[in-house]
Amino acid sequence: MATGKEKNAKNPMSLLIVLMAGLFLAILNQTLLNVAMPHLMTEFGVSATTIQWLTTGYMLVNGVLIPLSAFLITRFGQRSLFLVAMFCFTLGTLVCGIAPNFSTMLIGRLIQAVGGGILQPLVMTTILLIFPPESRGKGMGIFGLAMMFAPAVGPTLSGWIIEHYTWRIMFYGLVPIGAIVIIVAFFIFKNMVEPQKIKLDTLGAILSIVGFASLLYGVSEAGSDGWTDPIVLSTVIIGAIAIVAFVVQQLRHDDPMLDFRVFKYDIFSLSSVINIIITVALYTGMFLLPIYLQNLVGFTALQSGLLLLPGAIVMLIMSPISGILFDKFGPRPLAIIGLLVTVVTTYQYTQLTIDTPYTHIMLIYSIRAFGMSLLMMPVMTAGMNQLPARLNSHGTAMSNTLRQISGSIGTSLITTIYTNRTTFHYSQIADKTSTADPNFLHAFQNAVSNLMVNMNVSYDTAKTYVYSHIYKHASLDSNVMGINDAFMWATLFCVAGLILSIFLRDVRKDKLRKKKKEELSLLPAPKEAKES
C-alpha cells in the first residue's frame, strides 16, 4: 500500500497549488487590512491606537503558535492541521466581513491568526517532505511566490477595492476561495508522516508563550511609544528572560518542542542570519514607502499600490525561476547577485526628495524586487537542505519564528531611526530659518512684501501665510531626510548580508562527496583487487 508521502509525490504540483493558495490567502489578507485601517477607524469610531490591535493581536497569536508548530505537526499530522488551519482562517475571515463592531472584528482577526500562524511553517515543512534536496529549489521557489507576491500585490488590490467598493469585500472575497481550498485539500492531501502521540512539554509551552508574546508586544509598541517607555521596557525584559529560560529548558529536554540543536548546522545558522537581514530590509521598504508616497507626496492608496505592482509582477515571475536556478547553481551565486542588487537599489532610496519622479521610484522598486526574489527562498532552502529529515519541522518553525521576530524588531528600529532623524533634521532646518539670520530675514521680508502686493493682503496675513509655508516645507523635507537616513541603515544591513553570503555553500555537494567517499571506502584496495 502506498504511503501518504508516495501518494503526494505522484502529483506534487497539484498539492503544492492547494498549499500555496491557502498560504497566499493568509499573507494577502494581512496586507489588505493595513490599507483599510483608516476606513475601519471611521466605521467603528475607534482611535488609531485601538484599531492597531487588529494587527497586534494577529501578530501575538502568530508569535505564540509558530514556535509550537513543530509539536503540532508531529502530534496531529500535516493533513488534519492544514484543514483545521484553513477552517479557522476562513471562519475568522467571515467573522471580520460581517463584523458589526470593533470587538467582533478583533475576535475574527484572532481566529484568523490561529490558522495563519500554523500555515506558514506547515506548508514549508510539507514542501521539504515532498521534494528531495536535489529538486527542492523548485518547490521552495513556488513557496516564495506566495511569501513575496502576496504582500507586494496587496496594496494595489486593496487600494482598488476601497476606492470602488466597501472594505468588507476584502474579506467576503476570500471566504469562497478558502472554502474551495478546504474541499480540495480534504480529497488530495495525505499525511507524509503518520502523527505521533507525543506529550506537550507544558513548561516549555508556557515559557514560549510568555517569552515570544511579551517580546513581540514590547517591540511592536516601541515604534510608537519609544524604547524607554516603562511598559515597553518591562515586556521586552520579561520576554527576553522567558526566551532564554525556554532555550535552556529545551536544550536539556530529551524530546524538545522546538529543537535549538538545528543551530549546530553551520549553513542553517548562516542562512538564518542572512534571512534576518533580508527580512529587515524587506520590512523597511514595506513600512517607509507608503509613508513617503501617501503621507508626504500625497498619492492615493490606489496610486501607491499601482507603483508597487510592477515589482509584484517581477516577484511573481522570478520566484519559481529562482527556485530552478537554485537547483542548478546552488545558493551562493543567487545570494551574491541578489544582495548586490538589493544593496544598490536600497541605497537609491537614500536619495529621495519630495519631487522624485513617480516612474523612477517604480523602476527602483521593480529592480529591488528582482534582487529580493533571488534571495529569500534560495537562502532559506540552503539552510534547510543541511538539516536531517527529523529536524525539518523544527527548522521551519525556527526560520519562521526568527522571521516574525526580526520583522517586528526591524520595523520598530527603523521607526525609531526615522522618527529620531526626522526630529534632528527639523531642528536643523529650524535653526537655519531663525530670524536672527540676516540672509533668512532678508528673504523672509521679500516673500512677505511680494505676497502683500500680489494677493493684496495685510502684513500680518502675509506673514502668517509665509510662516505656514515655511513650516510645512520644513516638516516635509525633514520627514523625507528621515526616511533617507532609515534607508541608509537598511543599506548597511544589506552590505552585512552580502559579506555573509560569500560563505554560503551548497550542502547537496557536501552530501554527494560524502556518499562517494563512502562508496570508495567499500571498494577493494588495488592490491586486493589484483589478487582476486
Swiss-Prot record:
It is found in: Cell membrane. GO terms for cellular component: membrane; plasma membrane. Keywords: Cell membrane, Membrane, Transmembrane, Transmembrane helix, Transport. Pfam families: MFS_1. One of its GO terms (molecular function) is transmembrane transporter activity. The chain crosses the membrane at residues 13-33, 53-73, 80-100, 111-131, 142-162, 169-189, 203-223, 231-251, 273-293, 306-326, 334-354, 361-381, 483-503. It is a multi-pass membrane protein. The keyword Zinc-finger does not apply. SUPFAM superfamilies: MFS general substrate transporter. Gene3D superfamilies: MFS general substrate transporter like domains, Multidrug resistance protein D. The keyword Chaperone does not apply. Belongs to the major facilitator superfamily. EmrB family. This is Uncharacterized MFS-type transporter YhcA. It comes from Bacillus subtilis (strain 168).
